[in-house]
């Protein structure tokens, strides 16, 4: 019910009362202050409002209306539960994929600090002492950049806007490109990697993406692909030059036009999206989605709620379908506390 007029027909998450217009999420704290027989106005906390004096049986009272206490930022009532799995597959001799899972959820003085998580998959290219080195190096540089530039400042209370977080995440991917490109020049080989990274802060996710690893979101509305493949076939499909199913079968499906380490500079796709309890995030390499396909991923998400069990089952299905490439996957469940 509305704190001001008592109306009970407001929407659960409504900001204002439909009857009187009071701010539902900002109920003032009102208390009665007795000051004795003197009508002199007492001192009150900054921002508080004081009524005219009220007299009753020789005593003087004031009503003190104080601003509402600061509430927790949206998303502080969430927790992140992650599962992950990487597998060589049934054809390749070497696993050139790397994955990263970092979660942070401290609590200070009974108040929850930012809920933070960094989840990434990198699919290396270049063969022995090439692809596996590139994917590992990219995630090492990205994680250091995010920890120094995002996690530590957030824990110190230096909260950045969503756009600032995304820019820092993209800068981390750019730094990874710099490192891999430099290593490639020194080694004189053609190593490189794709990279998809998801940063979660409270009820928001920031996504940075280069290549054809993918990020998905699963919830009651189904499976949503959050990334666009930087591949020749994906571009052909977008331009109407190939059928959607050719993403799995076209002779040039493995050719990507954007990767980490290929050039001195790289364009990093980015976006910010809301999160809610019940959402599940999936980050995976093409060795998973090419073998299982979107329909198969959705089927497993329906069957298995536990993130680790879902990862294990999806890797099993990818291998049963042929296991033609390395298989890496991270699944993050966004749950209510």
Residue ranges, per PLM feature:
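PP2C/PPM-type serine/threonine phosphatase catalytic domain
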Residues: 1-337
């Amino acid at each position: 019910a509305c704190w001001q007029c008592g109306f009970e027909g407001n929407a659960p998450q409504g900001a204002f009362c439909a009857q009187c217009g009071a701010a539902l999420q900002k109920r003032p704290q009102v208390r009665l202050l007795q000051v004795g027989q003197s009508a002199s106005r007492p001192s009150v906390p900054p921002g508080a409002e004081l009524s005219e004096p009220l007299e009753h049986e020789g005593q003087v009272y004031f009503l003190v209306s104080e601003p509402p206490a600061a509430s927790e930022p949206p998303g502080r009532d969430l927790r992140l539960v992650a599962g992950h799995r990487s597998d060589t597959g049934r054809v390749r001799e070497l696993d050139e994929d790397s994955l990263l899972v970092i979660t942070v959820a401290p609590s200070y003085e009974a108040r929850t600090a930012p809920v933070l998580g960094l989840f990434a998959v990198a699919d290396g290219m270049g063969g022995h002492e090439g692809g596996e080195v590139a994917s590992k190096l990219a995630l090492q540089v990205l994680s250091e950049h995010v920890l120094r530039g995002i996690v530590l400042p957030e824990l110190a209370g230096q909260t950045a806007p969503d756009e600032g977080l995304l820019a820092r995440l993209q800068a981390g991917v750019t730094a990874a490109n710099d490192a891999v490109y430099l290593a490639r020049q020194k080694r004189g080989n053609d190593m490189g990697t794709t990279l998809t990274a998801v940063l979660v802060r409270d009820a928001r996710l920031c996504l940075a993406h280069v290549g054809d690893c993918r990020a998905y979101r699963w919830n009651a509305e189904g499976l949503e692909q959050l990334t666009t493949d930087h591949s020749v076939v994906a571009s052909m499909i977008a331009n109407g030059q190939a059928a959607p199913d050719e993403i799995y079968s076209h002779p040039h499906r493995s050719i990507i036009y954007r990767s980490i380490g290929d050039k001195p500079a790289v364009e990093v796709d980015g976006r910010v999206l809301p999160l809610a309890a019940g959402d599940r995030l999936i980050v995976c390499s093409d060795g998973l989605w090419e073998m299982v396909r979107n329909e198969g991923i959705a089927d497993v998400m329906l069957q298995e709620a536990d993130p680790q069990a879902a990862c294990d089952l999806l890797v099993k299905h990818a291998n049963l379908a042929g296991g033609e490439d390395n298989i890496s996957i991270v699944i993050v469940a966004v749950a209510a506390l």
